[in-house]
Amino acid sequence: MIEATLRVVERDGASGVSHRTVAREAGLPTTSATYYFRGIDDLLCAALTSVMTEDAARMRRLAAETGGGVDSRRSLARLMADVVAVPGHLLAEYELYLLAARRPELREVTQVWLDAAADFARAHTDDPTRVRVVVAAIDGLLLQALLTDTPPGVAEFEEMLRMLLPHATD
């Protein structure tokens, strides 16, 4: 159901989510959606939780595998380029992510991703202000990539990350 919800958000936006559209997308009867999710907010919250948890886990894996330095910047640049290469999925994620701006009860879910991104930045710097800037920049760069016909590639993302995290071991 959650994957079906994400596909509906990708295709129709969050406003297109209903028990009926999600069940149809999942190839299930509408009663299945209403059985597992009482309301539309429950579906949207579950989808947001899923993508935030998945993104946070991916960021934590990347940080653990590279441990800081130029390799981690390059790996993050590669990850960002891979993410923007599938703009529909990224758009669905950001639509759900921005839902938390209007619904305070969803903000806790977004913190999982923000904490993982901050942990990645802390592997490069002890400066709390720089950590916040890096996290905001990652979000901003991904969001801006949705607004262009030619999103940045690995090399361009890596150069931007080098400017944000200049003290990583080169």
At which residue positions do the language-model features occur?
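Helix-turn-helix
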Residues: 4-42, 46
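Hydrophobic/aromatic-rich alpha-helical bundle segments in the mid-to-C-terminal region
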Residues: 106-107, 111, 123-170
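Short, basic, alpha-helical segments at the C-terminal edge of helix-turn-helix-like DNA-binding modules
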Residues: 49-54
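Hydrophobic alpha-helical connector segments
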Residues: 57-90, 134
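Solvent-exposed, amphipathic alpha-helical segments
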Residues: 4-11, 58, 96, 137-144
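Amphipathic alpha-helical packing segments from all-alpha helical-bundle domains
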Residues: 56-57, 84-94, 99-132
